[in-house]
Regions:
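Acidic, low-complexity proline/glycine-rich segments
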Residues: 22-42
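Short His/Asp/Glu-rich catalytic/ion-coordination signatures at enzyme active sites or charged loops
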Residues: 37-61
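An amphipathic alpha-helical core segment
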Residues: 147-203, 211-220
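N-terminal export signals
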Residues: 1-16
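All-alpha RGS (Regulator of G-protein Signaling) helical domain and cognate RGS-like helical scaffolds
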Residues: 28-32, 60, 71-168
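Low-complexity, Gly/Ser/Thr/Pro-rich intrinsically disordered linker/tail segments
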Residues: 217-221, 225, 229-231
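Histidine-centered active-site/metal-ligand motif
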Residues: 57-62, 102-105, 178, 196
Length: 231
């Protein structure tokens, strides 16, 4: 390299380099089979997400996915041990559905934080640069992600993924919450747009819920998820 030449690393290359240094980053794909408490009180995301919704969402809906996954895995084990292969397809579908619910909710709680206490604002550092590289600007990304979330048909999620094949960030919709592995991607941020996530406060105004949600996004956690996904 000649003297005086300054080289710069692209944001996505910086992600890969930073990931190599993350010694204990939680790998998203390794979500443990455990039901954890929220990292904040149920009322911590007020006024953007109400306490009653958070309580029901976490203690009832997420808990049901966790319990359903445990049951499905236990039934699959019984089928294999007994040789009753006729039920494997049924319980495999149940396991995929409930695993998706447990997996995405475990991420969902962590990519939120109380406004002004880690939640809201705009991403900076490597994540901010990566978003700008992949979407043109943060505002363009926010507009595209919001549109994807509002437009999900029926129940599902809008998700920001790290695509492993070309190491790019992409926005995808998930109807319901399963079949995530078919995309060759790892979700690093997502919003639940099943009605149970917002109906008590916002009724049928999904767009209002999505717009309010940006005030509690935990960008530091999203960045850590990106580093973990790129390892």
């Amino acid at each position: 390299m000649s003297a005086g030449v300054v080289t710069t690393m692209s944001p996505m290359a910086a992600v890969a380099a930073r990931a190599e240094k993350v010694e204990r980053a939680e790998r998203i794909v390794g979500t443990p089979l455990s039901f954890e408490n929220l990292p904040y009180p149920y009322d911590a995301l007020e006024p953007y997400i109400d306490a009653k919704t958070m309580e029901l969402h976490h203690s009832k809906h997420h808990r049901a996915y966790f319990d359903g996954l445990q049951k499905a895995e236990a039934e699959l084990k019984k089928c294999r041990e007994s040789g009753d292969f006729s039920m494997i397809e049924y319980w495999s579908k149940k396991a995929a559905f409930h695993a998706g619910g447990h997996y995405l909710h475990s991420m969902f709680w962590k990519v939120m934080a109380p406004a002004g206490q880690g939640g809201g604002g705009t991403p900076d550092g490597i994540l901010g640069a990566a978003i700008a590289e992949n979407f043109g600007s943060f505002d363009a990304f926010k507009k595209q992600f919001t549109a994807a979330a509002v437009a999900v048909e029926g129940s599902g999620w809008a998700l920001l993924h790290f695509r492993t094949a070309d190491k790019q960030l992409v926005i995808l919709q998930a109807e319901n919450q399963h079949k995530l592995t078919q995309w060759g991607t790892v979700p690093i941020m997502g919003i639940d747009v099943w009605e149970h996530a917002y109906y008590l406060k916002y009724q049928n105004r999904r767009a209002d819920y999505v717009n309010a949600w940006w005030n509690v996004v935990n960008w530091k956690q999203v960045e850590q998820n990106l580093f973990a996904a790129s390892r």
